[in-house]
């Protein structure tokens, strides 16, 4: 599987750069479609809506993401995986949780990154 690169990755501009992500990362008509690296796990407790896309790619359709998030987000280094960082985008409404976007930074060129996973969660780790 070829990885979809986020060229000139800048962690401070995630929200403003989101439309520049490779298609079909962003689709203005249908909302956000975000790649998951390899085969995604289905976990019903996360209340994910998962759809198929392409060969062995899984795509998660976060139907409320385009107008369902606030400008608030937290950015943390993943405690488990090397060169992986997590964004927690706050969803609108009380107790709606976060959209967690895990991004893997290229070891050799840190200006390149790719999406590993995207899902809805209620805890920041």
Regions found by a protein language model. Give the residues of each.
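Ribonuclease/tRNase effector modules and their secretory precursors
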Residues: 1-125
């Amino acid at each position: 599987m070829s990885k979809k690169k986020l060229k000139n990755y800048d962690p401070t501009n995630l929200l403003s750069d989101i439309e520049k992500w490779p298609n079909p990362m962003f689709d203005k008509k249908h909302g956000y479609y975000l790649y998951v690296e390899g085969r995604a796990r289905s976990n019903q407790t996360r209340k994910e809506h998962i759809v198929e896309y392409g060969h062995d790619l899984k795509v998660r359709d976060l139907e409320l993401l385009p107008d369902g998030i606030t400008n608030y987000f937290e950015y943390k280094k993943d405690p488990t995986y090397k060169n992986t960082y997590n964004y927690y985008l706050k969803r609108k409404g009380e107790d709606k949780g976060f959209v967690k976007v895990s991004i893997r930074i290229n070891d050799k060129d840190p200006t390149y990154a790719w999406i590993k996973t995207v899902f809805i969660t209620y805890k920041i780790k």
